Amino acid sequence: MNVLIIGSGGREHALAWKVAQDPRVAKVFVAPGNAGTATEAKCENVAIDVLALEQLADFAAKNVQLTIVGPEAPLVAGVVDLFRERGLDIFGPTAGAAQLEGSKAFTKDFLARHRIPTAAYRNFTEVEPALAYLHEQGAPIVIKADGLAAGKGVIVAMNLDEAEAAVRDMLAGNAFGDAGSRVVIEEFLDGEEASFIVMVDGQNVLPMATSQDHKRVGDGDSGPNTGGMGAYSPAPVVTAEVHQRVLDEVIYPTVRGMAEEGNVYTGFLYAGLMIDKSGAPKVIEFNCRFGDPETQPIMVRLESSLVLLVEAALAKALDKVEATWDPRPTVGVVLAAGGYPGDYAKGEVIEGLAEAAALDGKVFHAGTALKDGQVVTSGGRVLCATAIGESVSAAQQQAYRLAEKIRWNGCFYRKDIGYRAIARERGES
């Protein structure tokens, strides 16, 4: 069989790499893909943009038996609705269900309706009432642009000056284009974050391995938020007890609530959670797709066929399958372009990929392209060096061995990915 993966990031390279391992799969097409998917075994890039929905459907109808969607934008735009109208097998939520990511205000109101634990919040479209609420609440406080802002439309303000600036920026200045025309202001939650990703078939849920990502650009979680600078799996904060609480208090009520409201959810569902000291989870955000960079370490740990799991989900039979995992921890370190998450150069030649490929581990491509036979940078997050180990510290060391082989003008990465789990291993926390 042939499979189409929609997207061009590190997540899509990891999904394509995993799908290609299934012996039944002859070819994996990636639209539009990157330099990593261009050279991956059994994979081929197709020059179709992720938002060219009609072209994607035409291609899928002629060439593949199954489509898996990577990024959020085509989901929110209705790619699943279009494929289903044409009778094409595709794994992902409809546009209605993808509102869980497409609108933070929709999500907060949904959580409140279904009594799913989350931070206290209010929605605003005008500056003055928003500022008045800030002064009532005090800092630290969180300000979020309502729509899709590539994971960067969230400001954690540690004082009221920062909070006011963020509100004025998003509402008066519309810093994030249309996404900022409404803001959600919510309480600052204390605790440890975890990424809890599941597959959903409309009714049944199959949990993926847990993970934790590192949103801040700098070591020690300093600097601005990014799309994610690295991740590890599993997340030790999600104990067996916390795992069950997340399913009972967050995931099942969400899947039931969406179905009750006429938005039956199929696809990957990613709950970004804050776990407090007592093990109680609260929802920070939902994403309607696999996380990036969490996909990379999670796919390295997945021993089951991803294709089989997706087929089970499309047959509404996720209760009949189990996923098997390598128990060893895996760490992924993102190599980024100088200046990210602000302005950065593109087109820098990347060296050392062959040396890294000779080591244990896997370098997944994200913002890369092929130019005159060379791999060059084409995005802010460029690569993700991913390795497995007997411990988190062993996996981390191996991931950094891979990263150290790779060079380009302006390359940088965090040096402390996995630090919380390593502190736990050493009995420091």
UniProtKB/Swiss-Prot annotation:
GO terms for biological process: 'de novo' IMP biosynthetic process; purine nucleobase biosynthetic process. InterPro entries: ATP-grasp, ATP_grasp_subdomain_1, PreATP-grasp_dom_sf, PRibGlycinamid_synth_ATP-grasp, PRibGlycinamide_synth, PRibGlycinamide_synth_C-dom, PRibGlycinamide_synth_C_sf, PRibGlycinamide_synth_CS. Mg(2+) binds at residues 285, 287. Keywords: ATP-binding, Ligase, Magnesium, Manganese, Metal-binding, Nucleotide-binding, Purine biosynthesis. It is an enzyme of class 6 (ligase). It catalyses: 5-phospho-beta-D-ribosylamine + glycine + ATP = N(1)-(5-phospho-beta-D-ribosyl)glycinamide + ADP + phosphate + H(+). GO terms for molecular function: ATP binding; metal ion binding; phosphoribosylamine-glycine ligase activity. ATP binds at residues 134-195. It comes from the Bacteria. Binds 1 Mg(2+) or Mn(2+) ion per subunit. Its cofactor is Mg(2+); Mn(2+). Residues 108-315 form the ATP-grasp domain. The keyword Kinase does not apply. Belongs to the GARS family. This is Phosphoribosylamine--glycine ligase. It comes from Pseudomonas aeruginosa (strain ATCC 15692 / DSM 22644 / CIP 104116 / JCM 14847 / LMG 12228 / 1C / PRS 101 / PAO1).
